[in-house]
Amino acid sequence: MSLEITPQLREELRSHFPALATGTVYLENAGGSQVPVQVADRIRDYLLESYVQLGAGYGLSKRSTELVHQAHSLVRLLMGGKENEGEVILGSSASSLLQMLSDCYSRVLQAGQEVIVAETGHEANVGPWTRLDRHGVETRWWRMNPEDFSCSLDQLEDLLSDRTALVAFPHVSNLLGEIVDIRQITTLVHEAGARVVADGVAFAPHRAMRVSEWGVDWYVYSTYKVYGPHMAALWGRSDALGELTGPNHYFIRDVPYQFELGGPSHEGCAGLLGLSDYLEKVVGVEEGSLGRSDIDRAFEIMAACEQPVQSRLLEYLCSREDVRIVGPEVDGPARVGTISFVHADKSSQAITEVVDRTEIGIRHGHMYAYRLCEALDLAPEDGVVRVSLVHYNTPDEIERLIEVLDQALA
């Protein structure tokens, strides 16, 4: 169902983000989004009024303990995980959570078993798995086709065997910007008796997550790229969690705390709850009433805000013969607003240096998809120019960027 996104709605949503009034145009959102005032207020209030340790018997400690529990429950709701199917593990970053997960697997996998790793991945979901080779676990590469930037299911099927322990891949490449068919991949992997580790960091800002519906075993995203504090969340299916022992103190057996070494940021958990306040504003429901259908609706609205903006940028880049888009050139439901390109003659660094002077935030480089840049024959340090949009970006901001790119690309 198409939604009409009016200028008034855009301004209403933007009004919740104080940083958007500073004069900087934020088009580097794949590196980290801005936060709404509701998130910042929750963090401030917690630090000033509730900054105590958890697990004690007095009232304020009990309330803080419940707040951290509520944050886990909210993130599970955001990720679309059914309550009896899995748990949410909170941590400082997707990189740290995936390294923790790999370390846990290193204690149960056997020499000669294999992990399949997608070449299109962010290093956070690549390096931890390739390093299992020190334990005799072999890496099989799910290679990208440089013609269409895809990792084919036929190739995956050929790679899978009775030695496959798990398959690690991005739901959306943070450089290419295309949504893959996660359910189809998961079905294929499960038929081979292996586990799925999906990196949803570049997907989560743009669409609603549905981990139970997809059937994934592990799914990670960064909360600071979805309008929240600098944290990350890893959802684990119950049977997958049951195969592992977490790294926390030996006497901590409760899940998820067994996997949260040192515990999550308490003020960060408060900030996560502030995101529910913002999403309630997006869909216009009463405070404290956010449900799963509201989350779905909020992300439908946000995707509808993004679509004309990313479509205009793709149209502009496609119109230039001196530019090659690294990723799908055609807009559509499987395309998010993370758009990368290279120039026929100019370095990516030279282009971004021109744009930087105009207080428009974009980025160049490998975006931590270092191996993907190598596979594309791009010098990783120069890499691509990446423009990454989210729902609070406007058509006027893109026109401003295009005006600057006309100069930078000339």
Would you name each region that the model predicts?
Residues 1-410:
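Pyridoxal 5′-phosphate
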